[in-house]
């Protein structure tokens, strides 16, 4: 499963899921196009093997003083399925992190980059709510070593249920503030070190 079947299932189910959500994706694209300058925005994340990978999510926009429903829900991340189809991401895997965050991760967590990042977080099974980053990284490393079809299926449906309940922010963090900002807030790194990690 680790070496072939997982990639095959991503290749098989990625397009199927994209077709299923394509009507909603099209509606979201029209709405975003009307209110934002661009339909999608690019983000660079750390892919398998630590390589930089470019992915796209719907652009953020506001309605009055509030962030739009699309920007604040799992709908924003529907375009990530294209990254699964192209082989950049997996349906289930460690949460995507930015290149800046990746540059600040300790070497002990490097094993999380042995697998492709996932739309649905593999850490969903280990924690009811989003854990501290280091706890999540440790769980990601454990997943990379022990991943199986059963664990992926469980993580998929657990994450899906949480997303339907509006909990997308607990594990999906593409384009949001991340590990670097948290380290700065804790006083672990300085503003200069944050700039160097850009």
Regions found by a protein language model. Give the residues of each.
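Intrinsically disordered, low-complexity boundary segments flanking structured domains
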Residues: 26-30, 42-46, 78, 106-113, ...
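Cytosol-/stroma-facing membrane-proximal "stalk/adaptor" domains immediately downstream
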Residues: 122-182
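Generic anion/oxyanion-binding catalytic loop in active/binding sites
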Residues: 16, 67-70, 142
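An acidic site on a long C-lobe helix of protein kinase domains
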Residues: 4-8, 70, 74-77, 148-152
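Short, glycine-rich, amphipathic interfacial segments at transmembrane boundaries or analogous
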Residues: 38-69, 120-138
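A hydrophobic, helix-centered structural microdomain
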Residues: 1-62, 155-198
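A short, structured surface patch at a secondary-structure boundary
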Residues: 57-122, 156-159
């Amino acid at each position: 499963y680790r070496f072939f079947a997982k990639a095959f299932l991503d290749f098989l189910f990625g397009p199927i899921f994209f077709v299923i959500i394509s009507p909603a994706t099209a509606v979201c694209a029209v709405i975003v196009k009307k209110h934002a300058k661009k339909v999608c925005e690019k983000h660079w994340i750390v892919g398998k093997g630590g390589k930089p990978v470019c992915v796209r999510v719907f652009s953020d926009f506001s309605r009055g003083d509030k962030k739009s429903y699309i920007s604040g829900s799992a709908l924003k991340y529907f375009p990530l399925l294209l990254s699964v189809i192209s082989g950049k991401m997996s349906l289930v895997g460690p949460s995507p992190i930015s290149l800046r965050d990746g540059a600040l991760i300790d070497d002990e967590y490097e094993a999380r980059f042995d697998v492709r990042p996932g739309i649905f977080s593999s850490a969903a099974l280990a924690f009811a709510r989003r854990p501290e980053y280091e706890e999540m990284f440790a769980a990601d490393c454990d997943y990379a070593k022990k991943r199986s079809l059963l664990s992926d299926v469980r993580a998929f449906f657990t994450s899906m249920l949480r997303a339907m309940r509006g909990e997308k922010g607990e594990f999906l963090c593409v384009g949001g503030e991340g590990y670097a900002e948290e380290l700065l807030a804790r006083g672990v790194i300085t503003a200069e070190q944050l700039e160097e990690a850009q």
